[in-house]
A protein has these predicted regions:
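Charged, low-complexity intrinsically disordered segments
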Residues: 2-279
Length: 279
């Protein structure tokens, strides 16, 4: 679609580190830009506003901001938030799973990843441990694993462990500290862990352009964490195992691979028209 108006960058793309309700929208550069953006938006005709809305949809996990503020179909909080954490699908459902593809008639194509490699930008950047500095509001993270484990500590109110996680750049130690979180409830964690990984990876990839471009370049291929040891986030098999190419033979659930595919879908939707914006 070729726009008929000069376009202004939507706030969630202008400030990719900001969450929906951050104080950053109420002070400083975020507040100033938001007022500037909405003043500009109100100068558009209804037809132009509809055109802009089609070009730049809100991120799916911004549930209380919509182009039409008086909509009656605002998401129910109990469906889209859990312990204050936004989820992407109603009640935190998974968009993809092994069942999605296991009986597919199409020839499936895979992208395997596992260990990080800070020296290159290739499939290793899909690892939770890959160095990939990004921010979420006022917090800066070394990698997606740090975000995940820090959110785990926050969820259960363990400020001491949260601080330790945020003070290290060693992903292995982050994971170990995450296992020490006090007041841990596995049932609560199971309800929200997938959404935490979705959120963290959205911020990671939207703030690291080379990595984002690589993620988008995988098209509709199935992303696979080929960890022979992880049967939850990975497939429990190495990439060289012939069973890795047969989803029915996977020993694990591949939650990380499927989460990254969902992140890929969302980034593709939200950023599909950024080339139309002024540099």
């Amino acid at each position: 679609m070729k726009p008929t108006i000069e376009l202004k960058t939507p706030p969630w793309i202008k400030f990719p580190a900001y969450t929906e309700f951050t104080i950053g929208w109420r002070m400083g550069a975020g507040e100033g830009y938001k007022w500037e953006f909405w003043d500009w938006y109100e100068t558009l005709t209804p037809a132009q506003q509809k055109e802009y809305q089609a070009l730049f949809p809100y991120p799916c996990f911004w549930h209380y901001n919509r182009w039409e503020e008086d909509e009656q179909d605002i998401d129910e909080e109990e469906d889209y938030y859990y312990e204050g954490i936004p989820v992407w699908q109603p009640k935190g459902a998974y968009k993809y799973s092994k069942a999605t593809f296991i009986n597919s008639a199409k020839k499936l194509k895979f992208v395997f990843f596992w260990k990080p490699n800070a020296e290159v930008v290739d499939e290793s950047c899909f690892s939770q441990w890959q160095p990939s500095s990004f921010c979420v509001d006022d917090d800066e993270y070394y990698c997606a694993e740090q975000y995940m484990m820090a959110e785990k500590a926050r969820l259960f109110g363990d400020e001491e462990v949260e601080k330790e996680i945020m003070n290290t750049s060693d992903p292995k130690l982050m994971k170990a500290l995450g296992r020490k979180v006090r007041n841990f409830d596995p049932q609560v964690w199971d309800k929200v862990k997938y959404s935490i990984v979705l959120n963290g990876n959205y911020y990671k990839f939207t703030q690291n352009k080379e990595m984002m471009d690589l993620l988008l370049s995988t098209g509709n291929k199935i992303l696979v964490e080929a960890s022979p040891m992880d049967t939850i986030w990975g497939i429990g098999l190495g990439k060289d195992n012939e069973k890795a190419h047969n989803i029915a033979s996977w020993r694990g659930q591949n939650f990380l691979g499927f989460a990254l595919m969902e992140v890929r879908d969302e980034i593709r939707k939200v950023y599909q028209n950024v080339h139309l914006l002024k540099k």
